[in-house]
Amino acid sequence: MATVKIPPVLRAAVGGEKQLSASGASVGEVLRSVAESHPDTHTQLFASDGGLNRYVNVYLNDEDVRVLDGLDTSVGESDTLVILPAMAGGAP
């Protein structure tokens, strides 16, 4: 199973865990596995069309999956996924 590192903003949705193990042959399958096990993460990770929410960045072994094959990027048993929500804000 791949390791999925959970950012602080999502930890309440996964019982406070900092990382999880999840199975899947692709990034999409691994993230869907996380969402099936922890339903509160689904709307935080996925848009209504099934793609990643635009403000969620996912890295596979330090490579942005968007420059790889996106949700179709292959994942191996010893790989690590990092979920990193984009931050925005500031004074108007």
Predicted features, each with a name:
Residues 1-92:
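Ubiquitin-like/PB1-type beta-grasp interaction modules and other compact soluble beta-rich domains
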